[in-house]
Amino acid sequence: MNVIYDFYNNGAEIGRLERGLGIVEFHRTKEILARYIDGGKVIYDIGGGIGMYAAWLAKKGNEVHLIELAENAVEYAKANMMQDCQFIAETGNALQVNRPDGSADVVLLMGPQYHLRDRGERLQSLRDAFRMLKKGGLLVAAGISKFSSMTWALSVYGEKKNASLMEFLDDPVFFNMIKGEMTTGDHVRPTEYPKFIAESYFTTAEEMKSEIAVAGFTVDKAIAVEGCIWFTPHLVEKWEDEASRERLLDIVRLTESEPEMMGMSPHFLVVARK
């Protein structure tokens, strides 16, 4: 847990959703959330980082509580994310959130589930979310595909960037990392790659749906976030063009619920009800 705390306390989330593939992730996640959340809801954003989603949801007229492990992320949210909205931001742990039973319309777990490598802790986080939700309340949990690092490495294999070849797959250290992810789900960041995401548990949509059901929820569906469009050549340039962006979004919307696509998407969301 200390490694995860340090990763986010050192500013890993600042700017991440405003550049590169993060822009697509942010756009699509908001698009999906908007299908289920309008205004007037009590929302607990557990592990919500610097408050990008908390701020957006607050602007839609919701009472948002950002509960984040990393103290510096909370302070950043207070200093930078509330110029035109207000939400509660405080430190807390997804395993035991300081909120009353049956007090939330929505609980977001868009981070904790893929940083809890122990299944018992993932279930504990889910059960605490269940406890806090009102009857019929909405859970949205995010997962990272166990194939995400592998597909990314394949997408850049042999490309030249800044005069260097992108040949991560030829590095035994990197290859052992993705082998662990694909076989066990465990992502253990090598010391040789300090900018990679901190220790995590990468999974499949089916496994996450199963764990959510074990915690007592009624699972609605899994939805691919970036889907298959993330490896589009020149994605950033195409995203900036409105017509091209809509074509890309049409593709991911049409395929977002296909089980065959779920492992190809870096992130997916599972939607469930209490």
Spell out what each predicted region is.
Residues 1-39, 44, 52, 56, 138-178:
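Conserved class I S-adenosyl-L-methionine
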Residues 44, 52-96:
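Class I SAM-dependent methyltransferase SAM/SAH-binding core
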Residues 95-107:
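A short acidic, Gly/Pro-enriched loop at the edge of an enzyme's catalytic core
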Residues 106-120:
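A short SAM/SAH-binding and catalytic strip from SAM-dependent methyltransferases
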Residues 116, 192-207:
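Acceptor-substrate binding/catalytic loop of class I
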Residues 123-135:
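A short glycine-rich, Lys/Arg-flanked "PGG" loop and its adjoining helix->strand segment in the class I
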Residues 207, 211, 215-274:
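C-terminal lobe and adjacent flexible extensions of AdoMet/dcAdoMet transferase-like proteins
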